Amino acid sequence: MTIIDKAISRKRLTELAQNFYGEMIKGVVDIDRQIMALDAELHSDLEKLLLENGSNQESLWGINLYPDVEGDDFIEFDSLI
């Protein structure tokens, strides 16, 4: 699991996706702090990482990223965590 606080390339996202799901990577975004956690099997693991690092629960959203997909289908908004 890693916290991302700056731009990340699609190539790096593709590499991270191989750790669990191959074509998809789970993430949790802190919309207030403008950071996200990536690279875990479960959104709840990423949520916990962000909470332990100062995020507030009400600011967290779960997402799925599909690095090899273009356009709107690149990101899937999963839920408010």
Predicted regions and their residues:
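Contiguous interface-forming segments/domains that mediate binding rather than catalysis
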Residues: 1-14, 67
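Negatively charged, low-complexity tracts enriched in Asp/Glu with abundant Ser/Thr
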Residues: 8-49
